[in-house]
A protein has these predicted regions:
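Leucine/isoleucine-rich amphipathic helices and adjacent mixed helix/strand linkers
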Residues: 1-230
Length: 230
């Protein structure tokens, strides 16, 4: 894994036309894998919020997210307007893949399978970040309760997403069709295409709230204001 990451770093340096600095760059790269992870994550502060959120989703989502779901999950927090500007014809699979690679600083990837998912490039990344509290050591301002705080933030991402005016965005009928009808099936398919993260957000907003509560973060205010059926 160290070799794979180092080759990627050197290739990026070469792509920038800095061939003469490759030897120096190689000497600067930590020889320990976990130190290399730390170096990658702290090399610059560009889009740090996006990086942390991407890592939180890959670490703590209830189930692995599709690339499109992760793209929307991140933007639901960092740039909500991008959710309603989503156009699958413009935001291609390649664009989403490059976004995930960039957001994660190269530590997450998209699987090559019939149903692609976003995951860490190797289990050692998860071990470093979670089991060894890598994020807490790198960014102590995130606090000692990183897992609880992460679920709190993921809950808020879900809440932001399900707060989108779906009817206006999808431009569907004024009156919702009956559930078993063909029209309803077509509307659900359109919603999945245009709002890929909607199903996950609806099904798991309370899961993340419950897990945050288990991590010591009170959800009393959230539950009081949440539109539960009476």
């Amino acid at each position: 894994m160290w070799v794979v990451l180092v080759v990627g770093i050197l290739n990026k340096e070469s792509d920038r036309g800095k061939v003469h600095t490759l030897r120096q760059k190689l000497q600067e790269i930590p020889s320990d894998l976990h130190e290399l992870f730390r170096d990658i994550l702290t090399r610059d502060s560009h889009d740090k919020d996006e990086l942390v959120l991407c890592i939180q989703w890959v670490l703590f989502s209830k189930q692995p997210l599709s690339p499109e779901q992760l793209y929307h999950a991140i933007y639901a927090s960092t740039n909500p307007r991008a959710v309603t500007d989503w156009d699958p014809e413009d935001i291609t699979k390649d664009v989403v893949k490059r976004f995930i690679l960039s957001s994660s600083k190269g530590l997450a990837e998209v699987t090559v399978s019939k149903e692609p998912k976003a995951q860490f490039i190797h289990e050692s990344v998860r071990d470093f970040l979670f089991k060894e509290n890598g994020l807490g050591k790198i960014w102590p301002e995130l606090g000692g309760n990183f897992q609880g705080q992460s679920h709190e933030r993921l809950k808020q991402c879900c809440l932001n997403y399900i707060s989108v005016d779906v009817a206006e965005f999808l431009k569907g009928p004024d009156k919702l069709p009956r559930a078993p009808s063909q029209q309803a099936a077509s509307l659900r398919k359109l919603a999945t295409q245009m709002l890929p993260f909607l199903e996950y957000a609806m099904h798991n907003v309370l899961y993340h709230a419950d897990t945050a509560e288990g991590g010591g973060i009170s959800q009393a205010g959230f539950l009081d204001s949440f539109p539960l059926p009476r």
